[in-house]
Amino acid sequence: MTSKVVFLLLLSLVVVLLPLYASAAARVGGWSPISNVTDPQVVEIGEFAVSEYNKRSESGLKFETVVSGETQVVSGTNYRLKVAANDGDGVSKNYLAIVWDKPWMKFRNLTSFEPANNGRFL
């Protein structure tokens, strides 16, 4: 009788914990929302994205703020940000940027930067 009770308890535990494990496993490598887009680290990444875009495109965008964002843990962290910037005309526009950051290697790379449109992420 005791072994049946132990077996049922273990089986119940597996049934309860298995969905939690599967849920956590599905998030590994997935995108997670950034709860505080005013965090200095997030703002620094946003400023880097605009600055790097300006260097590559010989543009003159001026960073304003990070509107929203997500992170993805890879070999480092991918930041997918919607940033507001203007090109000096006084009109703020949103841009989508992806930055790969590996702070322990002092490595940061702008992977993508484009005008935001309603059909995309964020």
Swiss-Prot record:
Family annotation (InterPro entries): Cystatin_dom (IPR000010), Cystatin_sf (IPR046350)
Gene Ontology biological process terms from the UniProt entry: cellular response to heat; defense response; positive regulation of seed germination
Sites marked Reactive site: G29
Signal peptide: 1-26
Residue ranges annotated for the Cystatin domain, each copy included: 29-117
Keyword Metal-binding carried by entry: no
Keyword Cell cycle: no
Alphabetic keyword roster: Glycoprotein, Plant defense, Protease inhibitor, Secreted, Signal, Thiol protease inhibitor
Domain of life (superkingdom): Eukaryota
Motif range (Secondary area of contact): 72-76
MF term (GO), any: cysteine-type endopeptidase inhibitor activity
A single Gene Ontology CC term: extracellular region
Homology family: Belongs to the cystatin family. Phytocystatin subfamily.
Role noted for this protein: Specific inhibitor of cysteine proteinases. Probably involved in the regulation of endogenous processes and in defense against pests and pathogens.
Protein name in the entry: Cysteine proteinase inhibitor 5
Source species of the chain: Arabidopsis thaliana
Gene that encodes the chain: CYS5
